Curated annotation (Swiss-Prot):
Similarity annotation: Belongs to the RNA methyltransferase RlmH family.
Highest taxon, organism lineage: Bacteria
Name of the protein: Ribosomal RNA large subunit methyltransferase H
PANTHER family: METHYLTRANSFERASE (PTHR33603), RIBOSOMAL RNA LARGE SUBUNIT METHYLTRANSFERASE H (PTHR33603:SF1)
Underlying gene: rlmH
One cellular-component annotation, GO: cytoplasm
Subcellular location field: Cytoplasm
InterPro entries according to UniProt: Alpha/beta_knot_MTases, RlmH-like, tRNA_m1G_MTases_N
Subunit field text: Homodimer.
Reactions it catalyzes: pseudouridine(1915) in 23S rRNA + S-adenosyl-L-methionine = N(3)-methylpseudouridine(1915) in 23S rRNA + S-adenosyl-L-homocysteine + H(+)
Length: 155
């Protein structure tokens, strides 16, 4: 199963609506679980490195028996066809394992997580909020499934 694990709740109504819609469309092909982890305290009172390390500890429990893809603007970029090939190859070679897409919180990722990730993927060189990253990732996973099932993707 594929999981999207994100620090911080999805709050914006238009993002929530989009996420629900893509999860509904994707359900035709596969089940994707969205896991929203709570924020690690007050951003204004906690030093960034401690905050990020707390986020890392929340992610860490999902690492065993999983292929962990870290979303980060410094990761590898690919077009939708290459992403579909990567996703298909990863699902095939990771039988019985979860594929985790890890979306960081407001301060980004702890340095510790980069060594634990199996792959680092960039949605763009630009930085997105965690909400937009989740929505963009879901759109791409829907597109991937359309590509892998030889279906067109047009509106």
């Amino acid at each position: 199963m594929t999981r999207i694990i994100v620090v911080g709740p999805l709050k914006s109504p238009y993002i929530i609506d989009g996420v629900k819609q893509y999860l509904k469309w994707i359900k035709k092909f596969e089940r994707i679980e969205l896991i929203q982890l709570p924020l690690s305290g007050d951003l204004n009172k906690t030093p960034p490195s401690i905050y990020k390390d707390k986020d890392f500890k929340k992610f860490e429990k999902y690492f065993p028996d999983s292929f962990n893809v870290l979303l980060d603007e410094r990761g590898e970029q690919m077009d939708s066809v290459k992403f579909s090939e990567f996703y298909d190859r990863t699902k095939t070679s990771s039988q019985g394992k979860h594929i985790n897409f890890i979306v960081g919180g407001p301060l980004g990722h702890s340095d510790k997580i980069y060594n634990k990730a199996d792959y680092i993927l960039s949605l763009s060189k630009m930085t997105f909020t965690h909400e937009f990253a989740v929505l963009i990732l879901l759109e791409q996973l829907f597109r991937v499934n359309k590509i892998l099932h030889n279906e067109t993707y047009h509106y």
